[in-house]
From Swiss-Prot:
Entry keywords, A to Z: ATP-binding, Nucleotide-binding
Protein name: Protein KTI12 homolog
GO MF term (any one): ATP binding
Biological classification of the source: Eukaryota, Metazoa, Chordata, Craniata, Vertebrata
SUPFAM superfamilies reported for this sequence: P-loop containing nucleoside triphosphate hydrolases (SSF52540)
A Pfam family matched in the record: KTI12
Highest taxon listed in the record's lineage: Eukaryota
Residues where ATP binds: G8, F9, P10, C11, S12, G13, K14, S15
Amino acid sequence: MPLILLCGFPCSGKSSRSQELQEHLEQSGRKVHIIGDHVLGVDRNAVYADSREEKDLRGSLRAAVERKLNKEDVVILDSLNYIKGYRYELFCLIKHVQTPHCLIHCITSPEVSSTWNQHRDKNEQYNQEIFDSLVQRFEFPDSRNRWDSPLFSVHKDEKLPLEQICNAIFHRKAPPPNQSTQMQPLSSTNFLHELDKVTQEVVTAVLSAQKTSIPGDVIMVPGASEKVQLPRILSMSELRRLRQQFISYTKLHPNENISQLANMFVQYLNQSIHG
């Protein structure tokens, strides 16, 4: 079912709007998934100070969105979504999945957002340098762009246009897929070989380590600095299913850095089994 994107300055009310949307949709019997930085438990100041970490975060959010998109549920992406190129990537994703979407721009002034930021708990605040940088880098949505449309721009004192949002996501046809979203972009035999090999090694390591592990343990796997966080014992069939999902996703969104495949798969496993 549909994807709802939130965008806006840091501390512009996106999470409050997401919760308001969730409550409204659940009252009508819809199942809603909210995905965002807070769900992944990231350190915002560390991530947004490092372009590589920020890129990894966007990839993790996109992967989490793709896992939840189906024919029944509504997915809300509660994040900055401040880069128009990233919003375009998500638009391509919904075209591939064949589901509608909309964008909600939470409008505040930098001064108001800065004040709201300062009133947050210390561990949830952006430091001022990061905050100012994100405000400066924000790329405003434009409803003339198909990836930013339909667009709902909501000021801080305005009510969400809930009826119009529901009409946009439930009574509008999904954008048709085009050749670029249907094509498999991979042609590198070496990449495919490494993808298959690395993911199989991780699965084998997890199955082996589980024999002497208990829920709550962390498992080291070959080729990864990330560790698998084990909330419960995972069956071979579940691991095989998650491995196949990861391979399918990575074929559509290839990463040139083969050395990071193991870490990416471990992150995918952790997000899937804890989600």
